[in-house]
Amino acid sequence: PIEDRNASIAHINEALLRIAEKARKHFNDIRIIPRLDICKITCERRGCQVKIEVNQTKRGLVSGDAKLHTLCDKAQELFGMEVEARIVSMPQLYGGKIAAALSRQHPRDLFDVMQMDVPVASVKDGLIFCLLGSDRPIHESFSPNLIDQRNAMGNQFLGMSEIPFSYEDFEATREELVKNVNEIMTDEDKEFLVAFEEQTVDWTTSPYASFRDYPSVKWKIQNLQKLKASNPAKLLAEADRLKKIFGIS
């Protein structure tokens, strides 16, 4: 079960402090900057910086338990060590990556999407979960305003990967992703997402009923309910844009 917000954040920060303490024991010259108000620590050593930040809202596991995965052979060879990490289910992991790629359109996210080794359709549940808890209107993910990311490509991605990824690759990957996420949605999925934006969902019949108990989705529902009360025309306008994209009359 997911703990309440205060208990969850307290336990997250306890875990971050344990990580910080282990790092100090291993590296005498490490500098650690805690920002527990936002569940974050920054570690700096010899010109390198690692940020560890936990999302305070998107808590909980969907589509299965977290499992231990071993660092890939290439990374083990590069860093000279073997590490295991507990990773969320593939639908939740890649669903979150796709949602981020559609929202931020950052080269790093689209590069990861290009390297995905599972079909988009197989992570649909995780994607829908992330869309329901997003701070952006759902229609923006299915018909995003395309952002010119040439500067980000040069300043925030170039040199991060040995695998070639040109700006043309970025644009092609983005176009293919938008096409794929639209194609994998069934008529029932589309009607559900529109009803969610309208706040008219019948949760008793929805295959995604369990999602409403998660903090991020509760938060989004709360905000949509506030909008429905204060500006119902705006709420319906956002839903109508999604209807138009989906071809729902």
Predicted regions and their residues:
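Structured mid-to-C-terminal alpha-helical surface segments
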Residues: I2-S249
